[in-house]
A protein has these predicted regions:
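Domain-level signal for soluble alpha/beta catalytic cores
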Residues: 1-784
Length: 784
């Protein structure tokens, strides 16, 4: 029999029960015992679902109250000293302080889990750190599963991935530690790249970590556990050679102690270049992601050891489309012929990244629904493939026929393929994606048109989304507020935002985006080729879940999406109103994207739709248009060899969306992250007239990269950290701009906040913007 299993299941619950339990606990409505009771009920339900789907092994330990990497840190006792942990078992207070911060200490850093939209808590390491088994969580959950008669397969983040994803910290800097999102100045970024005086290599901690892993494995063996899954997705990255050597020595060390059989799981990309080393590891099996990297199978089947299991992920754990079961079975047949029962079938990776259960979607039309599979349905697919291999395809002929019909329907449906969109794409030439003139000519035309002062001020787009705004939007959605009354309410809010910016003296105002719920959903709801679910939630981090749109077909823009609002806002002021759009790459990155054509093609379709909107904004008299691309860097492939191809089409998609703008229309873009150095040529290739970036937290250090690269266009470095409720002083902002003037010519600088102001309160925003405008006046007086 071919064994079937899952690498992990969503934690959130069918009705987001985990979120509700966490928020009730944080607001002290329930106690720890009740929180743990609800968590146990969720685990029980999720395990039984997987058992009902026919899984031979049930993952245990994949469930977390916040994040599995944070769980691993607590299990290993890797607790930063600032949380006051004094040994023993890590309590829930410490766990949540690390995740969310406390009244006295900031949270640990959070960043994206490889190239997914899930965020993990980044482990912090210091040179003399000691590791001890500091949590009973995993063993308690194994007992729960065994009490239900389940064949539990514990899931652990492996030692190489755990250390690779962490950061070295200088303990002396802890006293000055500030909460920073996505970067920390006291970290060694990447392997062997010392920053500050934290210049030790975290790989040197491996000999200290391994005894704790060995202790965990020994205890699991003592509990009668047959298999343990060690996740090592970092092997799909471009790891330095010494890390690969460390992998071999680490697993050799672990193999010497008592242990269940180890299934080493890789996913998210190919590990074919390390096939020989991985096959030689003293583990009982390997898992490969054949959705992301089907071509790697041959390297592993060649001389695959006769004593090892090979688990193959053929059902996509990261997207929502129904599997082509015939194709999956065909891929697996040679492996099944060679390996027999040593072949296991699984999803490509943990199902953490897909919604829970398609059966909840009662409002999706039958045709579209037939093309989809959420986590529960994906396990059904895995089980079906396993049966087809074990019993022959005749045993599952009816199920295969149903799946085949759905796949065929998706291939041929007129809802998917729009000839007009195909024609537009085919019509794109090499010159498409180039503005009419070079930046110098555009800059001159824009200065003549707008006559802005030196160091012009603007904001990034959104203004505070008050409870009144959210209430009006909800009432409108429910039909309790007519469209006409909703429009009046939003216009009143826009008028207030514009008036406030006039009073403050902001040179390039925005309309504040009160009508927008989310920067991707707002556009997706108005574009053809998109669909939305009611319950398609996935975890972003902790208790924050997102419901990505589904891009199922060719994308086009039936009618203008933002023009009415921008035109109204411009009618209220003589100053140039900035139009606000979300860029093609960000819309792509934050959606479930169709898998029947290259992502590049979908990005270009979205770019053409955005270009239509840019044209209509220009025709309506809007002369400054921002096309946001906060997710531009997130799309980077895991391996550097694949970067150029992605960056070429991503920058082209942006240029196509902006290309229609004449010289005197100024195109802005906005990005917010901490690492620009390695993609600056691609950012320059976007050819936006102005780029605004998040720099206040790094004290303008990010600008050094732009200066070294000699970035040719205008830059608005953020001087107001909108992630904090703190109001920065005039002196602080002037100080930041003085740093900026040292590395970027004064005539190319703008002054703006780091990001949109949507999450802040008016009581914070008003004084902060007043100080920003005053800072601009002082910097102008000195440098203009």
């Amino acid at each position: 029999m071919t064994s079937v299993h899952s690498l992990g299941f969503p934690r959130i619950g069918h009705k987001r029960e985990l979120k509700k339990a966490l928020e009730s606990f944080w607001s002290k409505e329930i106690d720890e015992q009740e929180l743990q009771s609800r968590a146990a009920q969720l685990r029980d339900r999720h395990w039984k679902i997987q058992q009902t789907c026919g899984m031979d092994f049930i993952p245990v330990g994949d469930f977390s109250l916040y994040d599995h990497m944070l769980d691993m840190s607590c299990t290993l006792g890797a607790i930063p000293p600032r949380y006051g942990f004094s040994g023993g078992l890590v309590g829930l207070d410490t766990f949540f302080a690390m995740a969310r911060g406390s009244s006295t200490q900031p949270a640990m850093e959070m960043t994206k889990w490889f190239d997914t939209n899930y965020h993990f808590i980044v482990p912090e390491f210091h040179e003399n750190m000691e590791f001890h088994l500091s949590s009973e969580r995993l063993f308690d959950q194994i007992k729960e599963a065994q009490a239900l008669g389940l064949k539990a397969k514990p899931v652990l983040v492996g030692p190489i991935t755990y250390l690779w994803l962490g950061k070295e910290k200088d303990l002396n800097a802890e006293a000055h530690h500030e909460a920073q999102h996505h970067h920390d100045d006291s970290a060694c970024h990447g392997h062997g790249a010392p920053v500050g005086n934290a210049c030790f290599d975290r790989l040197t901690l491996l000999p200290k970590v391994l005894p704790v892993y060995a202790e965990i494995l020994e205890r699991l063996a003592g509990m009668g556990v047959e298999w343990v899954q060690m996740d090592e997705p970092a092997l799909a990255l471009d790891l330095p050679a010494e890390w690969h050597q460390a992998l071999t020595s680490a697993y050799q060390t672990l193999s010497k102690g008592k242990s269940p059989k180890v299934l080493l799981a890789t996913y998210f990309d190919s590990v074919a270049e390390h096939a020989e080393a991985l096959k030689a590891l003293p583990v009982a099996g390997l898992h490969l992601d054949l959705r992301r990297a089907p071509q790697q199978l041959d390297s592993f089947l060649k001389n695959y050891p006769a004593d090892k299991v090979l688990s193959l992920g053929v059902v996509d754990g990261r997207n929502v489309w129904r599997a082509d079961l015939d194709a999956a079975i065909k891929i697996l047949e040679p492996a099944h012929k060679q390996l027999g029962d040593r072949l296991w079938v699984a999803p490509s990776c943990s199902l953490l990244h897909t919604p829970v259960d398609l059966d909840q979607e009662t409002e999706l039309d039958t045709e579209l629904k037939s093309w989809l599979a959420f986590s529960v349905q994906k396990l059904d697919e895995v089980a079906l493939i396993g049966r087809a291999l074990s019993e022959g395809v005749a045993a599952v002929a009816q199920e295969l026929s149903t799946a085949r019909a759905a796949v065929q329907s998706r291939k041929t449906s007129p809802r998917i393929h729009n000839p007009a969109v195909a024609q537009r794409l085919e019509g794109l030439g090499k010159d498409d994606g180039q503005r009419k003139s070079a930046f110098q000519a555009r800059e001159a035309a824009q200065r003549a048109r707008f006559k802005l002062p030196a160091f012009p001020t603007t904001s990034i787009g959104s203004f505070p989304q008050t409870p009144e705004i959210r209430k009006a939007r909800l009432q409108n959605r429910k039909g309790e507020l007519s469209n006409a009354d909703y429009q009046k309410a939003m216009e009143a809010e826009i008028a207030l935002v514009v008036k406030e910016q006039e009073r403050l003296g902001i040179d390039v105002p925005v309309h504040g985006e009160p009508e927008r719920n989310d920067m991707v959903e707002y556009f997706g709801e108005q574009l053809a080729g998109f669909a939305f679910t009611r319950h398609g939630w996935v975890q972003s981090y902790g208790s924050r879940y997102v419901k990505p749109p589904l891009i199922f077909g060719d994308v086009s823009r039936p009618t203008p999406m933002t023009v009415t609002w921008s035109k109204y806002a411009q009618s209220l002021t003589q100053r140039p109103m900035k139009g606000m759009l979300t860029g093609p790459v960000t819309i792509l990155q934050w959606s479930f994207v169709r898998d029947d054509q290259p992502r590049e093609k979908t990005a270009l379709q979205i770019a053409l739709a955005i270009r239509d909107e840019v044209k209509d904004l220009i025709d309506a008299g809007i002369g400054i248009i921002q096309i946001d691309e906060p997710a531009y860097r997130e799309g980077l492939p895991l391996k550097r060899k694949d970067w150029d191809q992605y960056l070429n089409w991503a920058s082209r998609a942006f240029r196509i969306s902006a290309q229609i703008a004449p010289d005197d229309v100024q195109i802005h873009t906005h990005m917010c992250y901490s690492e620009f150095n390695d993609i600056l040529p691609a950012i320059a290739a976007m050819d936006a007239d102005v780029i605004t970036i998040e720099t206040s937290r790094s004290q303008m250090e990010l600008l050094d990269a732009f200066a070294t690269f000699n970035y040719p266009n205008e830059i608005g470095p953020g001087v107001y950290d909108i992630h904090s409720p703190r109001v920065p002083s005039v002196e602080e902002m002037v100080g930041l701009m003085e740093k900026a003037v040292k590395v970027v010519p004064a005539e190319r600088l703008w002054i703006n906040p780091d990001c949109g102001l949507k999450t802040r309160k008016w009581a914070e925003v008003t004084p902060a913007l007043e100080n920003m405008v005053e800072a601009a006046k002082q910097v102008r007086a000195k440098h203009a």
